[in-house]
Amino acid sequence: MEKSGGRIVMDEIRSFEKAHLFDLGHPLLNRIADSFVKAAGVGALQAVSREAYFTVVDGAGFDSNNVGPPSEITGNKKHRFPNLRGESSKSLDALVKNTGKESLQWGLAAGLYSGITYGMTEVRGGAHDWRNSAVAGALTGAAMAMTTSERTSHEQVVQSALTGAAISTAANLLSSVF
């Protein structure tokens, strides 16, 4: 491959990172929509690839916890999408439904986080630091905890908020190092 061809590809990738997919008239809306769509695509890809992995592992008779063949096959495996077994249209419907649900969750998290960090940066006079990341991570973590199941306890919400704040703050602090 020529060096100029490699440069063109890298320039395209860099321009994709800077360009927004939508122009909704306000930078906040553009950022939320852009983050939502990109993360939803990643979430859908992750959900489908995870289910493909479990389908291959189950079809080959391997235990997903060990590398080799299982000594004893148990029915207690925990799959994220338990209705995805067989070759029926019901199985495909379950895959589409669950992939959509997961991509919506990923998009919600990214859009919410991106919108909160943008809003906090604007409110704080252009300061984008670990405080913005901590607040956005905490609110996003709490929102994600509330969307994952119907019976979410307040302890789970608090734990998810703290985890979101910690991960977001660490990512912000480490981004200046690397």
Curated annotation (Swiss-Prot):
InterPro entries: Tim23-like. GO terms for cellular component: chloroplast outer membrane; plastid outer membrane; pore complex. Residues 1-102 are annotated as: Contains beta strands. The keyword Transport applies. Detected in pollen and seeds. Present in leaves and cotyledons. GO terms for biological process: monoatomic ion transport. Disulfide bonds: none annotated. Induction: Regulated by ABI3 and ABI5. It is found in: Plastid, Chloroplast outer membrane. It is a multi-pass membrane protein. The chain crosses the membrane at residues 103-119. It comes from the Eukaryota. GO terms for molecular function: amino acid transmembrane transporter activity; porin activity; protein homodimerization activity. Keywords: Chloroplast, Ion transport, Membrane, Plastid, Plastid outer membrane, Porin, Transmembrane, Transmembrane beta strand, Transmembrane helix, Transport. Belongs to the Tim17/Tim22/Tim23 family. Plastid outer envelope porin OEP16 (TC 1.B.30) subfamily. Voltage-dependent high-conductance channel with a slight cation-selectivity; selective for amino acids but excludes triosephosphates or uncharged sugars. Non-essential amino acid-selective channel protein and translocation pore for NADPH:protochlorophyllide oxidoreductase A (PORA) and possibly PORB. Homodimer and oligomers in membrane. This is Outer envelope pore protein 16-2, chloroplastic.
